């Protein structure tokens, strides 16, 4: 993936990617699915370099969903070994590139070796202040919200907070990535047009970009296209756009030439 820099004033700060298509990529080449996952790791490395070069604040990669346990046992086993190997070998690169790594998801379900690598990688990179790299592993958006509810329920039980004090602002402190800037853009590869239980709370106002390109073929061109698409959009967050606002001030009717 090229290190081409994107020059935009309206550039996303936090991009999340649903990395879909590894298995189909391998099948198209007559290979086992694990070959697709290994190729996907290389695409992830290139995407991280691209994010660093373009000064993103955060990049979140959806690596393994809570639903992926339903896949064949051998594939799951291969993925766990691959994840362990990648983490163990990437620590020096994370330090060199000032990357702060965070694994979001229920890591208690992983084997002890993988849990050890996760904790080690997070500890070593904790003080880095460059790219915030989040890897969603054994993650589900519903799980995230539920574990947040459980945490805030404990606060209520202890009398730290009262039920009528709970609002969006303080609830979001109990879910993943609460310390980071919001997700501006979600990219999904592989041709599917859905979010697959990914960051349900965090992407409430995110822009979405879908591409038919399978993840191992994802490159700087597609990444740039996604950012360019984002830069052209007007994010209204429930408000009307500036043109409609002027019409409304004049006529009291914002329906002309507007999209609801």
Curated annotation (Swiss-Prot):
| Record Pfam families | Prenyltransf
- InterPro entries per the UniProt record, alphabetical: UPP_synth-like, UPP_synth-like_CS, UPP_synth-like_sf
Annotated substrate binding lies at: 21-25, 33, 37, 65-67, 69, 71, 188, 194-196
Q: What class of enzyme is it?
A: transferase
**Which residues does the entry assign to the active site, renumbered to this chain?**
20, 68 (proton acceptor)
Q: Which reaction does it catalyse?
A: 8 isopentenyl diphosphate + (2E,6E)-farnesyl diphosphate = di-trans,octa-cis-undecaprenyl diphosphate + 8 diphosphate
Q: List GO molecular-function terms, semicolon-separated.
A: ditrans,polycis-undecaprenyl-diphosphate synthase [(2E,6E)-farnesyl-diphosphate specific] activity; magnesium ion binding
Q: Which PROSITE patterns match?
A: UPP_SYNTHASE
DNA-binding as a keyword? no
Q: Which CDD domains match?
A: Cis_IPPS (cd00475)
Instruction: Give the record's keywords alphabetically.
Output: Cell shape, Cell wall biogenesis/degradation, Magnesium, Metal-binding, Peptidoglycan synthesis, Transferase
Q: Which family does it belong to?
A: Belongs to the UPP synthase family.
What is the name of this protein? Ditrans,polycis-undecaprenyl-diphosphate synthase ((2E,6E)-farnesyl-diphosphate specific)
Its source organism is Wigglesworthia glossinidia brevipalpis
């Amino acid at each position: 993936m090229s290190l081409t820099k994107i020059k935009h004033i309206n550039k996303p700060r936090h991009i999340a990617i649903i990395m879909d298509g590894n298995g189909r990529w391998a099948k198209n080449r007559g290979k086992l699915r694990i070959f697709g996952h290994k190729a996907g790791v290389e695409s992830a490395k290139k995407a991280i370099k691209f994010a660093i070069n373009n000064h993103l604040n955060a990049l979140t990669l959806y690596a393994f969903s809570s639903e992926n346990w339903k896949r064949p046992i051998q594939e799951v086993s291969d993925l766990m070994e691959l994840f362990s190997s990648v983490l163990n070998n990437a620590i020096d690169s994370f330090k060199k590139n000032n990357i702060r790594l965070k694994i979001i998801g229920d890591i208690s379900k992983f084997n002890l070796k993988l849990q050890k690598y996760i904790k080690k990688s997070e500890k070593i990179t904790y003080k880095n202040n460059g790219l915030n790299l989040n890897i969603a592993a054994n993650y589900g958006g519903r799980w995230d919200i539920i574990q947040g509810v459980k945490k805030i329920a404990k606060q209520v039980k202890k009398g730290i907070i009262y039920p009528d004090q709970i609002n969006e602002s303080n609830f979001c402190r109990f879910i993943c990535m609460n310390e980071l800037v919001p997700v501006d853009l979600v990219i999904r590869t592989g041709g599917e047009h859905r979010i697959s239980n990914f960051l349900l709370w965090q992407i409430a106002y995110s822009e979405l970009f879908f591409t038919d390109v399978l993840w191992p073929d994802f490159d700087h061109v597609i990444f740039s296209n996604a950012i360019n698409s984002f830069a052209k959009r007007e994010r209204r967050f429930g408000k009307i756009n500036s043109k409609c606002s002027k019409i409304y001030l004049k006529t009291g009717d914002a329906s002309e030439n507007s999209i609801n």
